[in-house]
Amino acid sequence: MYDIPAVPTFPDNETQLRVETSALRRRMLEGSWGPDLERYLQSQIDLSRRATWGTIDQSSNVFAHSCKALAVLYSEKPLVGVPREFREQAEPYLQHDGALDRSNFFSIMQSVQYKTIGIREMFLRVDVSDSKELLFRPVTPDMVYASAPAGDPLKPNVIYEYRLRQNMQTKKMFWTADVYDLRDEDNPKYQVQKVDMDGTFTEDLSDIFLGGNMDGANYPYRDSQGKAFLPWVVYHASMTGKLFNPYELSSVVSGSLQASCYYCFLKHLFLDSAWPQRYVSNLQLAGLSTYGTGEQTQRMSISADPSSILCFVPDPDNQSQPMIGQFEAGLKDPNQMISAITVYERRLSSMMGIDPASVTKVSSDPRSGYSIAMSQASTRDAQRRFSEVFRVGDVQSIVLGAKISNRFLGTNYPEEPVYNIQYVAVPMSPEELKAQREDIIQKMEKGLIGHVEAIQDLYDLTEEEAVEKLRTIRQQRIEFGT
């Protein structure tokens, strides 16, 4: 069993704050946010109360559920093409079971889009795998330092990636930084540096992990013209003109933690106060046990459930008549509380850009829990919303894949940004198709559109393709008499 050291801090406060923000979101998206919810609960309520609540309830995570609902761009594998003059050169790269297909690039992009929407940025490291295939490795921003020149703020020229490595002799794990630096284009750098806990570089380990010095003329990542490049692609959820936009949707993140806090309290009520409790007065409760002796949360209590009767003994200091009765249940109307939490969750999802009216309800009961399952029309809207910004990153990734394959695998793929990506939209439902047909027919009857425009709208074709389809339909009617 290995001892994994804590992740080192980054050298400046601005980067460290960004990293901590991104790390919380990553944990919420990956499902490892239990300790974060526990800390949030303890900041909301007194420790003595927290001790009675039991385990946390992580069933509600509006932030992650909303990101998952919006990440639909790669639900179907996109189509990639090139101009005719590049077709023969690009065919081994883009064809079925070609180099890009074997790398599982678009399958990986499903996870990349999911995390990009939540964290607002994602990094993709393009490399060659041990099996001599292209490798697209997603890296979350909380493990990366990057900066870009003021004149080109979306194109980084220096990137550090924190990576955990092992000393094969001592078997100890330690943190390193893979450094890619193009600030001096005449002297590009690729290094592996050992990182101290305060983020300072203490030792150059390039000879051990890279096999030698990779600076200057030895820099390995160059295109067919010999120009150095960074083997990285930065994906953005929205183009803001900045390299990082880490604090957008912060209200949704904190609100999701708050909603989970409400569900933890609801669980506590269900388990501990969903029944009327019997009691007596002027007597002492027998069988009390002390918990947390000597701690801040020390308390005396006894287990009870709906079938229990609490036993008391006479109070020697009180001669009054004992009384027997019961308290009303603390949770008298769970539906009212669930409805209030559901309204709160809907407001959070609307802040993510999900229209509550477009969400498909799992149950017709308005008190039912909130489930984010968008309609097909809203899913297509989400695809259109993200298609342009992700197309920029996808083209860069495919171009980088071609450059690295040419450099290290001896291929000859096009290195120019000539790749065209067509994302496959979610098909219309039968109801939507019927409404579309009726709308097109009405417009044609009113003389608002012609036959070519109608075919374009119905089948999503270009004008030339629509004309050709109309000719085919006319020929078939003549031939078959229909």
Predicted regions and their residues:
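Extended, helix-rich architectural segments
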Residues: 1-158
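Surface-exposed loop-to-helix/strand elements on domain peripheries
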Residues: 84, 89-94, 313-435, 470-473, ...
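Short coil/turn segments at secondary-structure boundaries
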Residues: 112, 126-129, 272-279, 358-364, ...
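Extended, charged amphipathic alpha-helical segments
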Residues: 212-373, 424, 428
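Amphipathic alpha-helical protein-protein interaction segments
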Residues: 120-127, 334, 443, 453-457
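Charged substrate- and nucleic-acid-binding regions of tRNA-handling and nucleotidyl-transfer enzymes
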Residues: 431-481
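Residue-level preference for well-ordered alpha-helical positions
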Residues: 71, 349, 402-406, 442-446, ...
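Extended, regular secondary-structure scaffolds
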Residues: 111-118, 123-245
